[in-house]
Each structure stands twice: as structure tokens, then as C-alpha cells.
Amino acid sequence: MVGGVPVVTGLAGTGGNACGAAPFVLALPEGAAPALFGPIDSCREVTVRLQPEALVFSTEPLPSEPGEIWVWNPVTGLNEALPEEFAADPAMGWETLPDLALAHPVEAMKLAPVLSALQTGLGPDYPAFAERISDLGSGDLVPGGYLGRACLKFTCDADWAVLYLDASTERVFAIWQVEGEGGPRLWPADRDRWTAAALAVLREIETQ
């Protein structure tokens, strides 16, 4: 029941692996014909929150793209709202690095100093790195820090990114590959600025 109107939510999709099923809303107002709203136009995983007067559908904000938001209520129906930009948690600093066990690299980028370092250091290259590190991947604590890897789902071997956080020096290191380019890009670009632990990660990647 939302705003005094009985509703049913469900998922609808065409199948295949391009996009998952998307939510819809079926309203069943008393004394009126049922009304169908949606499915929502999104390829991303959508969650729903029930509020007294509305249903709020949303996708997770990612470094590569903002979170999408849709709101349904009995008065205005289903409408897209302003997106939610990805942002670091200002309360999360290097002291929270131990919490990144088994965390996707997107979670690591919620550490305020990590996101700030990447956005500032990568500059115009940040969108390419963010796109790859936000997709299919995983991460975990490793000796010396945190290591996360991700890649674009359909071009995983050619479009990928690696994020390494050095715990002892509190420094951030990034490696990413763009399809069609000769080799991976590094940040910092000068290998002499890489710590021994970060260089070990880089050498492992270069030998794969």
C-alpha cells in the first residue's frame, strides 16, 4: 500500500545477458482500472525503497556514472528524478583501509583521500580509469595494502583497471588498459615514484 493505493511491483525483461530485468509498478486503485507503470528504462541493478507516499527506485552511484533515481506515487505516476553523483565518504580515511577485505574497488574509492588522489592525479584520464574500475571486478586486502581489479564486461581482456593502495605510505597507484592502445597506462606515470610493494603488483601484471 503506497499513499492509500494497493500496488504490486515486479520485474520484466527480454532475457539474454545484455540487460537484467527492470522493475515495474502495477497500481490497483479502488474503483478504477489497474494501471501499469514502467518497466524502468535501465540496464543496471535497481533497488526499491518503500516510503509512506512513494516508491523510490535507484541504482548505485559509481565512479563512472551517477546513480539513477525514479519515484512513483499515486498522484504523478513514475518519474525520473535527479541523479545521485558518486562521492567519497568524508568520514572514511586511510584508517578504514582494513575494512576493505573482499571489497570491490568501487568501495575503496569511497575513501576520501583515495578518490581525491585519483581525480586530481589522473585529470583527463580519470573517466577512462573510472569506467573500467567500476565494472566487473573484485578486490581484497593483500600484504602491504589493498588490491582491486575490474574490467569492462564485454571486452575484459582489453579494457581493465587495477587499483593498489599502499598502507604504509598512504599512497594510491593506478594501472589501466584501453582497448586499441599499445600498453597499459600508469599513475604515477614515473615508475621511480612507485613504492616497492606497488612495483611488485605492476611486475606481476606485466608478466601475465
PLM ranges: what are they?
Residues M1, T47-V48, S134-G139:
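Short amphipathic beta-strand and strand-loop transition segments with alternating hydrophobic
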Residues M1-G13, A112-R132:
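N-terminal, post-signal-peptide region of Sec/Tat-exported proteins
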Residues G3-G20, V25, Q51-S64, G145-A150:
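Short beta-strand elements that form the blades of beta-propeller/WD-repeat-like
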Residues N17, A33-P34, K153-D157:
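Short, structured surface segments that line ligand/substrate-binding pockets
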Residues F24-A27, D140:
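N-terminal start-of-domain structural block
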Residues E30-D125, D159-Q208:
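Acidic, small-residue rich beta-repeat scaffolds with periodic aromatic anchors
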Residues G121-E170:
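Intrinsically disordered, low-complexity segments enriched in Gly and acidic/Ser/Thr residues
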